[in-house]
């Protein structure tokens, strides 16, 4: 990865009940020299995620919410604390994140070839139908700052919102070969996994309505 001027990259890891994998993800990120800082945001986890993160307290920036505020709020909090020129988002449920994956994700934007990069898991020749909802992303921090309030309120619809914000800009999709993240069924009980899938689907639909049909969203959304 070559850049004409020295730049810094902050990596933000939103964490919600990822005790099985978060230690490995953080350890790998700390071992990769291109990151200026690792920011972990515990989003009100009810498992042992916070305990795992506290093991790295001297080496990471740790933000912890007492209640689950949603992925959008977690990312917004990380962006506010970030010192880097660029911010990378990495999910906490990855099992085999490597420096090769990180280099593939960062290269297009550090080379000046993109305004944003989305890295999607690719296995064999099978298409990834959810590629545009990937959590592995890189942006110029300054381009996100005007949208912090929207990001904070988007919950699990944050990827949909970011896609809309960067519509019409140069967004590069890069395959992250054989990258694996645990499914909810692998992390939760079957009942809880189904519940979380439904909640996340609702949040995505809610975000789409908010962006594309605000009048309808105002009618359907519960009042405060």
Question: What are the roles of these predicted feature ranges?
Answer:
Residues 17-31:
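Short, well-formed alpha-helical segments that are part of the catalytic scaffolds
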Residues 36, 50-81:
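Conserved donor nucleotide-binding strand/loop of the catalytic core
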Residues 87:
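Short aromatic/hydrophobic "clamp" motif used to bind/position activated sugar donors
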Residues 99-120:
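Conserved donor-nucleotide/metal-binding helix-loop-beta segment in metal-dependent transferases, i.e.
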Residues 117-129:
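Short beta-strand-to-loop element that shapes/binds the nucleotide-sugar donor at the catalytic cleft/hinge
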